[in-house]
Amino acid sequence: MTILTQSTTWQALSAHSQDIPHMRELFAADPARFTKMSLSSCGLFLDYSKNRATPETLNLLFALAQEAKLDAKIKAMFAGDIINTTEKRAVLHTALRNTAEQCIIAEGQDIVPEVQQTLNKMQQFVTSVTSGQWKGYTGKAITDIVSIGIGGSFLGPKIVSQALRPYWITGLNCHFVANVDGTSISEKLKLLDPETTLFIMSSKSFGTQETLTNTLTAKAWFLAKGGSQSDVAKHFAAVTSNVVKATGFGIDANNIFPMWDWVGGRYSLWSAIGLPIALLIGMDNFRALLKGAHQMDTHFANAPLTENMPVIMGLLSLWYGNFFNAQSHVVLTYDHYLRGLPAYFQQLDMESNGKSVTLNGTHVDYSTGPVIWGGEGTNGQHAYHQLLHQGTALIPADFIMPLQSHNPIGEHHDQLASNCFGQTQALMQGRTLDEALAELSKSALSNEEKLLIAKHKVMSGNKPSNTLLMDKLTPETLGALIALYEHRTFVQGAIWDINSFDQWGVELGKTLGNDVLTRIGADQEATVLDASSNGLINLYRRGKI
């Protein structure tokens, strides 16, 4: 057993999990449950009353957090301590939205001035492009941005840009390319005019396989359409640490933005990786996004554990994963603009907490990161919600909805809200056999048929959910929401004693992929790998099955 599972608090939680009453009983016993189990901060409202939790549950979870020294670990992150121990790096994405501009030390120096310089450089770049001052090689202004990245440098900018569609004020179009499948970039290029297109390549090394391949394809297209090598600087910019490679490619050094080792890819949208966002919504709105995230940082760093939104959400998710065998967690966004958030939170959580050893290398004897998935309400209600209501797996859910719509048409938003709240109620209370029989009482069915159908209509309920609300989706509230999930992820990793900031599984995939690529291009059939890999490579080389 690990230290965590040996703790008396862990053992108490395990025993306590067997004694939790049904949520119907909890609500019936305490009419003030909603008031007691909800809180507001940073423009967000969290209702966590529809959880299998009592005051004793929460007290035990908070005690577990204290035993794990969560307070100290939070302080260590914000202070710039080396908490990514396997890569010997600080974790300071919070510094990117540090609007207070207090001194933050990383690698022996105050990083705040460079962060602010980069924001100012972004401001100049955005102004130049959006004002029409930046000209392409034929003298035309830029109309289209193509953001080329992978992982965090792709998903963050894409999802945030999509979410903030009502704030697109610059008149530009933006296209996102990540997958190395040639179809992805080919379909984008078909829509574009090389004279008015600006590519932004995001890769720390300027060598990430997918990103470099797509960028080289974009450059070849640009040159084939009439541009010259000397024109590349007018149509390509980069976010990278490798200035030498970027300038060698043809990018002007003035249009190269930095990346830092103390910012992981999945936490990087707040940096110059967010240039596509800023080019669409303008720098004032981009700074508002940072402001909202900073507000959540401040709340996370300073609020007591018992009133701390990321802490409460993280602990409740851990509660279900470790004591109820919940293997997945669903995120349901009742706002069309937020439809991409489940995929973003999927990467954030699963890449961070998909680990199986503790910081000292001990194999864990408890579940860590769950599968994160989800989608857009009300679409999901006609698909996978059936499994949430009557399936055999326990799947905790987060419902996210703005109270006000950017498009208040007729009763659309009223219906959306009623569906959202109705789903949380249905998951919580379910439907008993007696209730199902009562619904069938006036039907022409026989009593035997009524009983059979009623059994199929029974729903156990007691399915946990959180509801997150905001007045309206704005850059500020979106920033706070994303930072909330970042810190929720941190909380779980801190208690599980794992490193939430490396990704060795991703690195292994890259290494083996490069090895396979070499064998695909070899002159002879593959024979030295396992039989399956050899067979697949050789089938691919033949081009037919």
UniProtKB/Swiss-Prot annotation:
Which pathway, per its entry?
Carbohydrate biosynthesis; gluconeogenesis; Carbohydrate degradation; glycolysis; D-glyceraldehyde 3-phosphate and glycerone phosphate from D-glucose: step 2/4
Q: What keywords are annotated for this sequence in UniProt?
A: Cytoplasm, Gluconeogenesis, Glycolysis, Isomerase
EC assignment: the record states 5.3.1.9
Compartments reported by the entry? Cytoplasm
Example of a GO cellular component annotation carried by this entry: cytosol
Q: Which reaction does it catalyse?
A: alpha-D-glucose 6-phosphate = beta-D-fructose 6-phosphate
Q: What's an example of a GO molecular-function annotation for this chain?
A: monosaccharide binding
SUPFAM superfamilies attached to this UniProt entry: SIS domain
Cytoplasm as UniProt keyword? yes
Tell me which InterPro entries the record gives.
Answer: G6P_Isomerase, G6P_Isomerase_C, Phosphoglucose_isomerase_CS, SIS_dom_sf, SIS_PGI_1, SIS_PGI_2
A Pfam short name: PGI
Top class in the EC scheme: isomerase
Q: Which residues form the active site?
A: E351, H382, K510
Biological process (GO) annotations held by this record are:
gluconeogenesis; glucose 6-phosphate metabolic process; glycolytic process
Q: What does this protein do?
A: Catalyzes the reversible isomerization of glucose-6-phosphate to fructose-6-phosphate.
Q: Which family does it belong to?
A: Belongs to the GPI family.
Recorded protein name is Glucose-6-phosphate isomerase
Source species:
Shewanella oneidensis (strain ATCC 700550 / JCM 31522 / CIP 106686 / LMG 19005 / NCIMB 14063 / MR-1)
State the gene name recorded for this protein. pgi
